[in-house]
A protein has these predicted regions:
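Signature of the SF2 helicase/ATPase Hel1-core->accessory helical subdomain module
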Residues: 128-132, 167-180, 209, 238-349
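Conserved pre-motif I regulatory segment
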Residues: 59-157
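Flexible phosphate/Mg2+-sensing switch loops adjacent to catalytic phosphate-binding sites
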Residues: 115-149, 177-193, 221-223, 305-326
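Inter-Walker segment of RecA-like/P-loop motor cores
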Residues: 212-249
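Conserved Walker A/P-loop ATP-binding site and its immediately adjacent core
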Residues: 166-170, 182-215
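Short loop/turn elements that form and flank the Walker-type P-loop nucleotide-binding site
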Residues: 111, 150, 190-191, 232, ...
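Walker A (P-loop) phosphate-binding loop of P-loop NTPases
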Residues: 161
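Extended, charged/polar low-complexity intrinsically disordered regions
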Residues: 1-93
Length: 349
């Protein structure tokens, strides 16, 4: 009897279709080619008009490669990124973004703009790219298409010490901008609460301190009333994910008490992806089911099993392949000259 042919192996990086889609949108195929140029002090900071030097280089490449995105649109995104960076840096002595942080924020601007402007057309464009990737890998990738309902999550795979906290704070501002703009056209669009899910009580306190430093109103969730107000104008509720349960008890709260149209930001989002603690993944998914989620982790790759033959593992890998918008994992961090214990503070020179 002939041996059954095994499916060709696909690397985890091959699954990152969303990340490659946006690299292509600005005229490149890999982050390293941008880093070789932009990982330099001469590109950090702003020009005389208040725009980043990163913006000028990316606009030049996009124009040279005949990308559909215009210089004016890139400048518009750049101006918002600069404004948000200035706002969260006022109490920090100013912030100067690194190139990988800037690209993360640029891709987020591009995604949210398309997501809120014309979700159907955006979904079609993403699926055309998936079709081309499936063909390029001769069917080995076998990525299922996006659906409109599956587009409400972005994930950032960024190395420890690379400044994920600052990304989170600017992501909040980015989302609120596009949400408010969309509400002018469709008044029924709404977010119930903005929630930061932290892995433990100590990290909740750290998030509160960091959000306060960035000038963003926040409170640590209190079951008896604190942090339960609706709407982003009431500030952000920081919740230790261990306090979420199916049914609330003395020190916990039922996940369903928050409704499902929330903006949820998940720290250390790799937690909850294993079969032993998958309940946390279920809880946070329900919180953002009719809203939106931003997830952050240095170790998505380690938490996801790209070589598994189990259906549930392959589905999870595909889900995050279509959600990870930035891969600045440790290999890039190390390659850019940052050591294992390095931490970026983004201090303005």
């Amino acid at each position: 009897m002939a041996k059954k042919k095994s499916s060709p192996s696909v690397s985890f990086e091959t699954y990152l279709v969303l990340f490659r889609y946006f690299l292509g949108e600005i005229g490149t195929t890999e982050l390293k080619s941008l880093g070789n140029k932009l990982n330099s002090i001469e590109y950090e900071g702003l020009d005389e008009n208040g725009n980043t030097h990163f913006h000028h280089y990316i606009a030049q490449i996009a124009k040279m490669k005949h990308c559909s995105i215009t210089t004016d649109k890139l400048r518009e995104y750049d101006e918002r990124i600069c404004r948000y960076t200035k706002e969260i840096g006022e109490n920090r002595g100013g912030i100067s973004l690194k190139y990988f942080q800037y690209i993360s924020l640029l891709f987020t601007e591009m995604y949210l703009d398309n997501y809120f402007a014309d979700r159907s057309a955006f979904c079609k464009s993403l699926n055309e790219f998936i079709d081309s990737e499936n063909a390029r890998t001769l069917g080995a990738l076998a990525m299922e298409p996006y659906t409109i309902s599956s587009m409400n999550k972005l994930a950032y795979m960024c190395a420890t010490g690379s400044g994920k906290t600052l990304l989170m704070h600017i992501n909040i501002k980015q989302f609120i901008f596009y949400l408010k703009r969309a509400k002018r056209i469709n008044g029924s669009i709404a977010i119930n609460k903005i929630i930061v899910l932290s892995p433990n009580e100590g990290m909740s306190k750290q998030h509160l301190n960091e959000l306060t430093l960035s000038g963003i109103k926040a409170t640590i969730f209190n079951k008896d009333g604190g942090g339960m107000s609706s709407g982003q104008n009431e500030g952000i509720a920081i919740i230790d994910m261990n306090k979420l349960k199916e049914e609330g008890k003395v020190k916990t709260v039922s996940v369903d008490s928050f409704e499902r149209n929330n903006l949820v930001l998940v720290d250390e989002a790799h937690r909850g992806m294993s079969s032993t603690d998958g309940v946390w993944y279920d809880y946070r998914t329900r919180l953002s089911e009719e809203g939106f989620a931003f997830e952050y982790s240095a170790t998505f790759k380690q938490a996801l099993n790209a070589t598994s033959s189990k259906k549930e593992d392959r589905q999870m890998v595909a889900e995050y392949g279509k959600s990870i918008i930035m891969d600045y994992s440790y290999k890039y961090f190390y390659g850019d000259g940052y050591g294992k214990d390095y931490r970026i503070y983004n201090l303005r020179a």
